[in-house]
Regions:
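Charge-mixed, compositionally biased segments that are often intrinsically disordered regulatory tracts
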Residues: 2-90, 232-240, 244-252
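Electropositive, glycine- and tryptophan-enriched low-complexity nucleic-acid-binding patches
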Residues: 55-57, 69-70, 75-139
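C-terminal anion-handling pockets and recognition modules
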Residues: 9, 54-56, 183-252
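Short, solvent-exposed loop/turn segments at secondary-structure junctions
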Residues: 63-67, 101-105, 114, 149-152, ...
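Short beta-strand segments
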Residues: 59-61, 142-148, 171-174, 227
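Acidic/histidine-rich, metal-coordinating catalytic segments
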Residues: 124, 136-153, 176, 181
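Generic structural signal for small/hydrophobic residues in well-ordered secondary structure
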Residues: 10, 62, 98-99, 105, ...
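RNase H-like polynucleotidyl transferase catalytic core
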Residues: 82-89, 162-185, 198-199
């Protein structure tokens, strides 16, 4: 496929033929194995049914990160408004290692300066406290869905998973199959609806904001389990509204 990069997107001939000025998207075509995705997708459907029946706890695991510079999301604003959000200095990041329970819709997050195997093990220890077997208490088997990323398949991580094999089973996702991981959408919700358009002084402030955002997200999803997340509201003016996205502003 060849995509024209010409900037002449106002050409009348193209408008007459219903052309639109659009940006191409990346595709995972050629990197995915269709049969494997279908097979694992069917297995996960069965796992969801088991979780909904109360037979197991199903968790979708993944990693993401947040920046001290503002995450920019689309908002309602007056048409033509030039939205700017201060973004001073060099951006620093905080890694988020999380697991989503699709039945209770609760997100569990461990924050760290890095995304390493030791950080993944720290998140497993977090799951130990929540779902691991405890003396005198019944415990459900836990199924953790993960991709084959290096921090999950390292020697340290595999040893940590093996030590929990009596109560935790891993469902490995196929290569390049983010559409099978339910937590992917929740990362977007967390950033776009709870962390957007904010500038953080340092990583400590960002870390605190992440945990507050997770608490707010979990409360919202528990109170309104069928409601879609709210759009962040940055309103300017009173009429001629349009959905737009702010830009970072590095001026004084």
């Amino acid at each position: 496929m060849r995509v024209s990069a010409s900037a002449d997107h106002n050409c009348p001939r193209r408008c007459e033929k219903k052309f639109r000025w659009r940006r191409p998207r990346h595709t995972l075509k050629g990197r995915q194995i269709a049969d494997e995705i279908e097979r694992v997708g069917l297995r996960l459907q069965v796992r969801k049914q088991q979780a909904e029946a109360g037979d197991i706890v199903l968790l979708y695991g993944d990693e993401s990160e947040a920046l001290t510079h503002p995450y920019l999301a689309r908002v309602w604003a007056k048409a033509g408004a030039d939205l700017r959000v201060p973004a001073p200095g060099q951006a620093k990041k905080v890694a988020m290692l999380g697991s989503l329970d699709p039945v209770t819709r609760q997100l569990i997050v461990h924050t760290s300066p890095t995304k390493r195997s030791s950080d993944f093990v720290a998140h497993l220890e977090q799951l130990d406290r929540l779902y691991g077997p405890k003396p005198g208490q019944p415990a459900k088997p836990v199924v953790l869905v993960e991709d084959n990323g290096p921090i999950h398949t390292s020697k340290l991580s595999l040893a940590a998973l093996a030590a929990r094999a009596h109560w935790l089973t891993v469902e490995w996702l196929p290569k390049s199959a983010p559409e099978l991981n339910d937590v992917e959408v929740v990362w977007h919700d967390l950033k776009a609806h709870h962390l957007a358009h904010q500038t953080f002084a340092d990583t400590d402030a960002l870390d605190q904001a992440i945990h507050q955002a997770v608490d707010a997200l979990n409360t919202e999803r528990m109170v309104l389990p069928l409601a879609r997340p709210r759009i962040s509201a940055m309103k300017i003016g009173r009429e001629q509204w349009a959905v737009t996205r702010p830009r970072p502003f590095v001026g004084g």
